[in-house]
Structures are given as C-alpha cells and as structure tokens.
Amino acid sequence: MTEIAADREIKICCATFYQSDLVRALFGDVFHPGGLALTYRLGQAIKLGPGDRVLDVACGRGASAVHLAERFCCHVTGLDYGVENVAAAQAHADDEGVAHLTTFRQGDAEGLPFDDGVFDAVISECSFCTFPDKATAAAEMARVLAVGGRLGLTDMTVNGQLPDDIQTLLAWVACVAGAGTPDAYAETLRRAGLGDFTIEDQRSALRDMVNGVRRKLMGVELAAGLGKLDLGDLDLDEGKRLARRAVELIEKGVAGYTLITAKKE
C-alpha cells in the first residue's frame, strides 16, 4: 500500500468510526476528553468574542461548534471528513437555534477549502493527532487564520515511545498511536508560522473519559450480544484491551491530554 493510500485509509476509518452507533453509545455527541466544559475553557483561552469568525476542524457532530456559538456569540464554521457528521451537525445547530451562527461542510484538514486569512480563530479538539500529515494540517490552519488570529488545540499526548502492541489502526482512530509530546505539537505549529504558545496539562480529563468508556464497554458488549448494537468490523476485545492499556499509560505518565494555544504573528 502506498503512503497516500495508507493516509486515506486512516482518514476514512476515522470518519467511519466517529460516525458509528458504537461511538455514540460510548461518548454521546461529545467525543473528546473534558466534554463541553473543556471546550468552553478552550474558547476562553483563545479569547473568543462576539462576531469572531471561528473554524472548527474535525467538528464531528457539531456539539462544540454549537456550544461556542451559544456561549461566545461567534460565527462558527465546522469542517469534518465524514458526510454523516456534517448532516448531524447542521441538524443539531437547527435544533439549538444557532443555525444563523453556524455553517458545516465536508472537507479534509490537510486541504482546507477556504481562502487565506478568513478566520479569527481555528480550533481542533482531539483530532490533530489523527491527521496523517500533521505538518500540512498545521500549515493549512495557519494559512486560513488572519494575522493576529488564534489557534486552539486540545489533544492526546504521548511522552516516550508507545509500546508496539498499541500501534494499530484502531489506536490511530482512538487518538493514541499518532499522538506526540506537547513540545512536538508546538514545534509543528511553529514551523507553520505560529508563535506565542501556551500549554496546559489536562490529563485528568483524559483519565475520567477513559474510565467512563471502560464502564460503558460492558453495556456495549451486552447490547451487541442481544443484537441491539451493530459493532461493524470493530473488534470489541481489542477495544477493551486498548482501554485497559490507556489507563496503564495514563497512570505511568506516558499518555496525557493537553490544551495548546498559539497566535499567527
């Protein structure tokens, strides 16, 4: 398989995984550690305000985009690789009465379909580590930011080398295998032309989420056994193993979660 084909497989698997009934059973409509409370903290950290033009890269089903529009009265454009997610996000915005403040479209983080400098802020939650070409994604996010615009990321981090048994495709879509250190993320963003960094440790949010997923996996297994939930091609035993390993890695300080902000200067 060529590198381009492998990258495309990762993107398709990520989109399919995060549109699945299984993911909604495990996470609801908010897929990232910390939930909407951490989304609000991210909005504060990049100083969102009324009228700001915000891009949410890998917006999923739109929970964060809608929340930011409601709380900060900003105009949010959500972009996701999954067509079903885009439709669900628009429906969610309609239901919450913020359709006038939100727009959703399908697209690729490594080739953003927007002109240069059209956003005051760009965010991406628990997604940057899944992008196969992080340098290109960072350059694209910097490109669409206006001068003085702010970038905000929350994402998985890994300090040290991950064990071989967690370097799997499922680990990629579960935001583990492609993660780096906070400093590595910052360096990638710096090379894209961003600066003025802040970094916050948010590992407690990851620990809480993983423990919640482990509890819910028991219910998922029961529902699947009763024919009430389609697991598709997902190996549930592998999912449970990854969850156990994630807890071990968090406790050892190998895996974590971070909030990073930067500015286009």
What feature does the model see in each segment?
Residues 110-121:
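A short acidic, Gly/Pro-enriched loop at the edge of an enzyme's catalytic core
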Residues 178-193:
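Short alpha-helix
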